[in-house]
């Protein structure tokens, strides 16, 4: 099964919503998307992966170009306001050999367990993250995460990355 979305996909999470597991910007395995727009306001989302979930189940490798990638997102635009993300936010790449092109992520007045550029062998071309008035909390009810972490790469790779923190 495969999906190839040449247009934009928009995901909007409204105030009070709870995502009790993982939110994927892209899809699983053979799923490719041109643009993903994620907007969440006053929501609780256990974890977010900007790209997809490859899990090493496709023909992708760590160095597969985003245009040739069978699992990935070319453009990621993410805006999170007043959100709680207990297990963390992955701003580019994804799980397994997922590839993202350009990610632009804005986080304001939120609380996170961790933030990553790329995740678990994911790869990204460009990631820009702007965070304002955001805090990192060590322990969350319902989460096994026992630490705060900021990492540009959690295995995998990234060509260019920028994190900006204001009032955090």
Predicted regions and their residues:
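Surface-exposed loop/turn motifs in large extracellular/passenger domains
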Residues: 1-21, 27-47, 52-88, 93-168
């Amino acid at each position: 099964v495969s999906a190839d979305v040449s247009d934009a996909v928009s995901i909007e999470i409204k105030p009070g919503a709870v995502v009790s597991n993982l939110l994927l910007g892209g899809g699983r395995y053979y799923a490719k998307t041109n643009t993903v727009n994620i907007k969440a306001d006053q929501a609780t989302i256990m974890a977010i992966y900007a790209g997809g979930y490859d899990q090493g189940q496709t023909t992708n490798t760590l160095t597969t170009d985003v245009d040739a990638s069978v699992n990935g997102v070319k453009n990621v635009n993410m805006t999170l306001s007043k959100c709680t993300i207990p297990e963390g936010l992955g701003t580019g790449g994804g799980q397994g050999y997922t590839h993202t092109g350009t990610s632009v992520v804005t986080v304001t007045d939120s609380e996170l367990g961790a933030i990553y550029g790329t995740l678990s062998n994911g790869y990204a071309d460009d990631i820009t993250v702007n965070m304002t008035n955001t805090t990192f909390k060590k322990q969350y009810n319902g989460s096994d995460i026992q630490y705060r972490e900021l990492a540009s790469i959690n295995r995998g790779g990234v060509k260019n990355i920028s994190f900006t923190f204001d009032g955090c």
